[in-house]
Amino acid sequence: SYSDIWKEYLIPSKCNDRGLVWSDIWIGKTLLFDFDSPKNPLWAFERADKVATHLTSEYGAECFVVFSGSKGFHVHVGLEDSRRLVGIDWEDYQDHKDPLKVIGQAHADKVVELASEAGVNYTTEDRSSNFRQGIVRCPYSIHPKTGQIVWPLDMKSIEKLRSKDNLTIEGVAKTIHRWDIPNQST
């Protein structure tokens, strides 16, 4: 099955059996913070903003805050900054039986630690996007449950959201991007 084949790409020895070099496929992993609050998305934003601000001011990290299109916000940390903050060199793990599992756990633990440094409790948040095969929606894609756009925030959008007291998911979307998309067929 495709699932079985995919699993073979996760393990260096299985890649080797297929004539592939594991380190050519897996080039890095980034830190990702996932903040959700279905009833109050601005609470999720405030926590994401606090973590991104902390990482930028304390570590000089390049961070991107993204509206998830649903319940909250993601903070993406750039690849080089993620490597530096986690302190893992992928080459040190390529001979491990399941390096992506070990590396993913290190990333998941680091988001809890860094959020705590920023004064944000992350112990109940979803850390799965940092695990071995963690995924998040791609910016500018459409969230299938809400129909909202997964939207990266620029400073103008961040400032607008900082000035709000309470918004629904739709209210967040209206605040950060236009709804009347030109040339869209009806």
Task: State each model region's role.
Residues S1-P41, V120-D126, T186:
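SsDNA-processing nucleotidyl-transfer enzymes
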Residues T30-F33, E62-D92, I135-S141:
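Histidine-centered divalent-metal-coordination microenvironment in nucleic-acid enzymes
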Residues E117, R127-V150:
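Accessory, usually C-terminal, subdomains that scaffold auxiliary metal cofactors
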